[in-house]
Amino acid sequence: MVVAAGSKFNLRRGNSGSCSSHNNVVINDRDGGEFSRRNKSGCFSSMVEVDKDPSCVSFTTFNILAPIYKRIDPQNQGVRESDCRSFWLARNQRILDSLLSESSSIMCLQEFWVGNEELVHMYEERLGDAGYQLFKLARTNNRGDGLLTAIRKDHLSIVNYRELLFNDCGDRVAQLLHVQSVNPILQNQKDSLNQEFLIVNTHLLFPHDSSLSIVRLDQVYQILQYVELYQRENRLKPMPIILCGDWNGSKRGHVYKFLRSQGFVSSYDIANQYTDSYADAHKWVSHRNHRGNICGVDFIWLYNPNQARKPMKTSWAEAVFSILKFQLRKASLSEDDAFTFLKGDNCTDSVTYISFSEALRKVKLIGVPYGLCFQQLQDLWNQADVDGNGVIDFEEFKQKIWNSTCSEHVCMEDSNPEQEQEAIGFKVKNAMLFPREMEKGLWPEDYSLSDHARLTCVFSPAKMSCSSL
């Protein structure tokens, strides 16, 4: 992992030529504008909400589908929108119209075409003129796209900005911003208080293969580790953490469950009173992928400082064991067969470190460029070997691997009131997807602004008590 602050990138100019006509190309869009409806909580659009209450903060996350990836001719899959300047220019103007009509406090965009100077300038000019400060980050290895985070300067000021480069097989990156409100949220004759919080914008690897689950989990693990390191090194007081982006995984996935075990909640689900149950897992969608499948993958995660969280390494190990179990069940192995598989050629009725390592190699969790490193393997083994006797017996296997779940709910431990302090967190006031059909689990066929929905959430400040430790 390489962490870089304020890196500079050379932007490449894309094809600026006009495009000849292509058959079966749909360019009409449900551009949308301001939200003109209420949801069940009775809230209006984010812009209206923040104007009514300046202490509110609104977030928008949107994968805007880079022109280098957008296919525009069903008869010729090799033709991309980046080949047709008039197409990508018009679509991105409509994207900007949509974003500016919403006018959120924070915009987190993914698949931003950093490799095209004209498009970059268009976003810088229009968002800059609207009062936004922009932060761009290209994916590694000159992939062409990256992230863009825009902050409204009349709402928020930047305390710090950091960049996280995973340097993995997906060339993924993340942005970390430490911001505070421009106007005090609490004020009296003696002092005033400005709200501070941390924002992450990222775009996780697409799970082209189930073996890539370990990479996606590691990306999230690195993000949380880096956020924790930043908080510790800067001796920050307890504050909310918001993770925005395209997570390329649904509510049933390992990443979702890992984040839930770390105290994060999906803002959209909270606003709509959806649970983690299977029945609520498919109530909404936000993406139609290149395979034609629709699912909900775009999230604005909220962690409040009063939330309990498991030790991160424990949650991570539970998630890896869950991935291991999935791979074993994918091979149609029963509980007994799975234990035998982990034992390998070992004659005793237990799993040794060597046989455990070999089993993980066979299911592609180690021994591949994107697999677990040596230290991670050691950490995993230490979690599984409960009694520390150097082997995993059948009971430990059942407890830690076969019957283990990445618990999505963490109970608050008893705390000492003398060790508590007051903090300012966030309350979810509203959250909306556009187009609206996606809130019903439907994908509108005439929507072509992107292959993702735009997700916007509105938060209001809330006092809460949290541990000072």
Regions from the language model: what does each represent?
Residues V2-E49, C169, S181-Q187, Y221, ...:
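Metal-dependent phosphoester-hydrolase catalytic domains
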Residues S16, N24-C56, F62-I64, W88, ...:
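Structured beta-strand-rich core segments of catalytic domains in phosphoester-bond hydrolases
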Residues V57-L65, A90-H121, A150, L177, ...:
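Active-site beta-strand/loop signature of hydrolases that rely on acidic residues for catalysis
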Residues I64-A90, H208-V215:
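Acidic/histidine-rich helix-loop elements
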Residues K70-Q75, V120-M122, D145-L147, A174, ...:
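Short aromatic-enriched loop/helix-cap "lid" or pocket-rim segments at secondary-structure transitions
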Residues N76-G78, Y123-G128, D168, L217-D218, ...:
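Glycine-rich, phosphate-binding/catalytic loops in enzymes
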Residues Q77-D83, I106, F206-D209, F321-L324, ...:
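Short interface patches used for recognition in eukaryotic signaling and trafficking proteins
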